Regions:
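Hydrophobic residues embedded in beta-strands of well-ordered beta-sheets
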Residues: 59-63, 70, 126
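A short local loop/turn or secondary-structure capping micro-motif enriched for an aromatic residue
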Residues: 62, 71-73, 136-138
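Short amphipathic alpha-helical segments
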Residues: 1-5, 9, 81-88
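Long, charged/polar, surface-exposed segments that mediate recognition or autoinhibition
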Residues: 65-104
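Amphipathic alpha-helical segments
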Residues: 2-23
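Acidic, proline/glycine-rich low-complexity IDRs
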Residues: 94, 98-164
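A short, sequence-level motif marking secondary-structure junctions
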Residues: 58-59, 79-82, 132-137
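Amphipathic, interaction-prone secondary-structure segments
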Residues: 20-62
Length: 164
């Protein structure tokens, strides 16, 4: 591991996974602009379901299923009392492991697919995380919604999915 932050995050996830359950590699990223390469710790939490994160010098990028989140403080520093990027990333990961994550895919017409994610709390309320639009090329227009829910299975040490 290059960064101590990686160990800090793994310690926070220890109720769910141990270091033996994950794959950790040091990554070197060559940048297109010719500047010095960036180095990161890549930690694969659930390879089958594309759940992993990478820690850089001042940023954490978290990938989950078909989406991802960036956590950093260089765009805007946290105000007094606000959590820093490490705390925000750790909180997100802990919620990913303890709450259900709902994925809603909506096809409208023949050329657009919208994908949205939301954390679902025990009381049924949800926190919208964001969404993306993808270009598709269907021959026939259609209106379709597919909802699936992801939840961490502690016994199997991986995420499982159910489609509604």
């Amino acid at each position: 591991m290059i960064y101590g932050i990686t160990k800090q995050i793994l310690d926070a996830l220890s109720p769910f996974l141990s270091e033996e359950d994950v794959e950790i590699t040091a990554e070197k990223h060559i940048l297109d602009d010719g500047s010095a390469p960036e180095y990161g710790d890549k930690v694969i939490l659930d390879k089958e379901n594309n759940v992993w994160f990478e820690v850089f010098e001042n940023e954490i990028v978290l990938f989950y299923f078909t989406d991802h989140e960036h956590f950093d403080d260089y765009m805007e520093r946290p105000r007094d009392g606000e959590p820093d990027y490490v705390e925000r990333a750790t909180d997100f990961l802990q919620r990913l492991f303890t709450l259900e994550l709902r994925k809603t895919e909506t096809v409208a017409g023949s050329d657009m697919l919208k994908v949205e994610y939301a954390f679902v709390f025990p009381d049924g309320s949800a926190e919208f995380l964001g969404g993306t639009w993808k270009q598709i090329a269907d021959a026939e227009p259609r209106n379709e919604v597919c909802v699936s829910t992801w939840k961490f299975d502690k016994a199997q040490k991986k995420f499982s999915q159910k489609t509604e």
